[in-house]
Amino acid sequence: MVVNKQGSVKSIKRKARKSKKVVSGRAKEFTYKGYSLEDLQKMSMEELIKILPARARRTLLREPNYEQKKLMEKLESDEEDVKTHVRDVIILPNYVGKIVEVYNGNSYFKFEIKPEMIGHYLGEFVMTRKEVKHSGPGVGATRSSKFMPLK
């Protein structure tokens, strides 16, 4: 029986996945449509709008409302934690590294803005609905459940 010296098929696939993330021993550098993070941060708003997807482009071309303007000013300032209810603000390169707390309807969800989030809305990273976890039937749900002891 011939034994593969490299290992099983799973281990080979695992090594291939890992090699995509790391380029010759160093972490893969972030780029957005061919631009590095430093290039994106140096760009003017007009240049940045041209490379964003259509939905983000349309949102930024419109005049932001009062709450959006206020949040954008806070994100561009040196404040550490920014709490907000506004979920429809596009993440720009200037906001990378900031810690934001976004309201999900029940509580604030805290996260750090990473370069991969550029061009997305803040609300995309905060779930508003909880996953449903079903348990046993309640009292009166079935005929036999009438005789189940109450907790």
UniProtKB/Swiss-Prot annotation:
SUPFAM superfamilies linked: Ribosomal protein S19
The keyword Electron transport belongs to this UniProt entry's keyword annotation: no
UniProtKB keywords: Ribonucleoprotein, Ribosomal protein, RNA-binding, rRNA-binding
InterPro entries (UniProt xref): Ribosomal_uS19 (IPR002222), Ribosomal_uS19_CS (IPR020934), Ribosomal_uS19_euk/arc (IPR005713), Ribosomal_uS19_SF (IPR023575)
Matching Pfam families: Ribosomal_S19 (PF00203)
Record's GO cellular component terms: cytosolic small ribosomal subunit
Keyword flag ATP-binding: no
Domain of life of the native organism: Archaea
GO MF entries: rRNA binding; structural constituent of ribosome
Family the entry assigns: Belongs to the universal ribosomal protein uS19 family.
Summary of the function given for this chain in its UniProt record: Protein S19 forms a complex with S13 that binds strongly to the 16S ribosomal RNA.
Protein name (Swiss-Prot/TrEMBL): Small ribosomal subunit protein uS19
Organism lineage: Archaea, Methanobacteriati, Thermoplasmatota, Thermoplasmata, Thermoplasmatales
